[in-house]
Amino acid sequence: MDGIMTNGSSEAHPPMPPPEPIERPPTPPPPPPEDSALPPPPPDTSAPPPPPEDLPPAPPPETEPKKKKVGWGTKRPAPTPLSVEELVRKKREADAAAAKPKFLSKKEREKLALEKRAQEVAATRRLKSEHASNGVDRSATHSPSVSSEGPNGDARSIPTGPRAMRNSDAAPTAPAAMRHSQSHNKNYDLAPPPPPKSMSFGLTSGKGDSRFVDEDEAAAQAALVKQRYMGADQTSNFSAKKKRKRTTDRKFNFEWNAEEDTSGDYNPLYQHRHETNFFGRGRLAGFGDDVAESVAHKYARALEDRDREAGSIRAREILEMERRRREESTRNQLDKHWSEKKLEHMRERDWRIFKEDFNISTKGGSVPNPMRSWDESNLPKRLMELINRVGYKEPTPIQRAAIPIAMQNRDLIGVAVTGSGKTAAFLLPLLCYIAELPRIDEFEWRKADGPYAIVLAPTRELAQQIEIEAKKFTGPLGFNVVSIVGGHSLEEQAYSLRDGAEIIIATPGRLVDCIERRILVLSQCCYVIMDEADRMIDLGFEEPVNKILDALPVSNEKPDSEDAENPLAMSRHINHDQHRYRQTMMYTATMPTAVERIARKYLRRPAIVTIGSAGEAVDTVEQRVEMIAGEDKRKKRLGDILSSGEFRAPIIVFVNIKRNCDAIAREIKQWGFSSVTLHGSKTQDQREAALASVRNGTTDVLVATDLAGRGIDVPDVSLVVNFNMATSIESYTHRIGRTGRAGKSGVAITFLGNEDADVMYDLKQMLMKSPISRVPEELRKHEAAQSKPTRGFSSKKNNEEGGGGGKVGW
């Protein structure tokens, strides 16, 4: 509006309020002014007239209520002080009302839904108007109809929006610069543009795109974009503790781990794959192997009933297909332990775990799998009844591995620690072998041809122990067993052979005497067992063993070819006769060179079974070593050990020299313990009486040389004391093997001195390998225990017992 001009001058007045559509009452016009009178003053516009009270209410806004302008006509309400009590009361009332459930009727719910929908529509329209104003506001705000001056040329308040948008919805006919060229840059809106909307990568503005990206995925994509343009992170994630994977020729391993893989899909469809639901038990839809097998058998029987000829052929094919399918399905059966599976379901992986559990290792071609129980041994029923009667509940590791091999007529080398059940491991297959041969007492000439089997043992005590164990089975089966050992007259032993014997248990020296004196021949011997072969070599029996093996017939010797590994070929009789191929087995705790030489000469393609590690002590023996020098100090320490009451009888004390046995035995008797001695100078009757007194519990302590270190089975020995350290680590191994037998635990105490420097290194290594033993600091730091000494063969046995021990088996 133009300003009001009076007397050729303009006077600025406050801005007029917007005109109201009010009908004012008619007023009479003022009288005309006189010529000399001054013009009347302008009307006072300081306060507008009050609006009438009967005005109708204003119409509601279409989209949003208009903001009231702050001007001269607004009244500011008087400030009232805040009341804390009122605020607390209102808050409590609001909390109580919110805690109570409020029932809404259907009309109220519809009303709330309509109001919510109206708010959403209003928000959508507001967003659209903001988008449209981003490109139009800057030019539309300079319309000439919007002036910064009032009706009298005075400054006005800043408008709230472009007038073109308030008054007209028509599109402009020309650019704003052409329409308002005079006020082109006047009052230009210098406000910054609104910030852009936050957008996630992968979002589109199309109406039909309903996909969205999660915040984690958007952050991951933003991190990838940042890494692409800002470079890789300088912080290294390398860990020196990370285990490096070894690359082989068949499999290539990268330097990173599986959790460092960045090739995963960001599409949620592939991150959360659908899993198949399995119903019932077994395979999908509840059809297990047992159900499928029963269905296959029913179908096969139906085919056979329908057609005897073609149906039976088709039924066999179906059953074969089902068997193959079952085998294929059991190959991937990894959820059961080998003890829970049937024998036909055992896989190669299960057998490998089984061997690791019992520390079994085998070598040789076509070696059968071990047996898991006596029921899988394929032994005759009569023999199984005897096993149950004797009380063999579970087979030992050497029995599990050796019996299946021996049942296939294979030559065998068994390497096992002492007290592991080797006697039953070779006796049971031996009885099965000779049970298929004719009875030896059938004809007189058969009695004179000698035994079917011979068992060689290094000492008399071990031979008699094997005889006692063998008679538990041979008596009920009707076989005759005879032992030929030194200490008895040849006439007495010849008399025991008058009725013939299927099995002869002998020491090498006495058996050579019988062969040379024509008391015994080996014309039909077809089974040879050498127990404690390394001990026989140590005692100087290598030459007698070779004489015995050379005296065997060559007609039943196995061929040195692949047929020796074929159980079917070795089980056949030779030339349709009753004779069978000779089977040779060797059991030992260590494998010295002489034993390997005998095995290469007389065994044909043998299978090698090793229980544990060769030459190591059993894990059930706790080894203690004490550095004590001098006989008197050792006797005092021995007395303290026996008097402590920690160990119960029987106890074995080993010495190196014969004359020390009686001296130490007298000292033990003075301490109040009963004792007996056992060495090479004792007669056979004295030896048997000494062992019997220890076994029946009448004697507490047995003082012996290395003679009792091999094969002597005294039950429940709780302590072994090495008063003198053995001259070799092999002898030490067999000494401490007298305790901890048959799965029981035991203790071995060794007195060590500077004279035992030759065995200190091997002793330290054995103690370090034992999980329940400890290496003393004196032995660990000793100079002789730091490196293995170089010794000559002549100094291996340089004591009195070694000189006379070679005759113990004669």
UniProtKB/Swiss-Prot annotation:
Residues 403-609 form the Helicase ATP-binding domain. It is found in: Cytoplasm; Nucleus. It is an enzyme of class 3 (hydrolase). A motif (DEAD box) lies at residues 531-534. Residues 620-783 form the Helicase C-terminal domain. Its EC number is 3.6.4.13. SUPFAM superfamilies: P-loop containing nucleoside triphosphate hydrolases. Residues 801-810 have a biased composition (Gly residues). One of its GO terms (cellular component) is nucleus. It catalyses: ATP + H2O = ADP + phosphate + H(+). PROSITE patterns: DEAD_ATP_HELICASE, HELICASE_ATP_BIND_1, HELICASE_CTER, Q_MOTIF. A motif (Q motif) lies at residues 372-400. GO terms for biological process: mRNA processing; RNA splicing. The keyword Iron does not apply. The keyword Cytoplasm applies. One of its GO terms (molecular function) is ATP hydrolysis activity. ATP binds at A416, V417, T418, G419, S420, G421, K422, T423. Residues 14-62 have a biased composition (Pro residues). It holds the Pfam family DDX23. Residues 1-210, 778-810 are annotated as: Disordered. Component of the U5 snRNP complex. ATP-dependent RNA helicase involved in mRNA splicing. May destabilize the U1/5'-splice site duplex to permit an effective competition for the 5'-splice site by the U6 snRNA, resulting in the switch between U1 and U6 at the 5'-splice site. May also act to unwind the U4/U6 base-pairing interaction in the U4/U6/U5 snRNP, facilitating the first covalent step of splicing. This is Pre-mRNA-splicing ATP-dependent RNA helicase prp28.
